[in-house]
């Protein structure tokens, strides 16, 4: 019986610790036409983080991002040198999830094909850095 209790306690602890690990995922309309646009969505499960954090996405040449009003979850938005950048000096504490949405325009001259778009969510807690990769694939037709 003692072994059963210890096994149950270890399993409960492992599940509890797993639940406290932040996660992030980036998604987009899978297909876009050159000259068109699509919405990029970033879902971040920040758990109980309330620290400095940032999200970055490096767009290919010919792609340009603009902020969608009201969809930045209190982050500062920048787009420069093909890089989308959201920055929080302190993540919102009211909830455990954050959602970002921004518009991506694809210029007429972009070649047809698949584009792997790298990105990441990074945060700092007690002088330790954490980073979660958030790649996404978009096909230009």
Region roles according to the model:
Residues 30-51:
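Short beta-strand elements of extracellular/lumenal beta-sandwich folds
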Residues 45-50, 58-62, 107-109:
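Short solvent-exposed strand-capping/beta-turn motif centered on an Asx-Ser/Thr pair
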Residues 52-91, 134-136:
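A surface/secretory-pathway sequence property marking extracellular, secreted
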Residues 105-136:
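Serine/threonine-enriched low-complexity regions used as flexible
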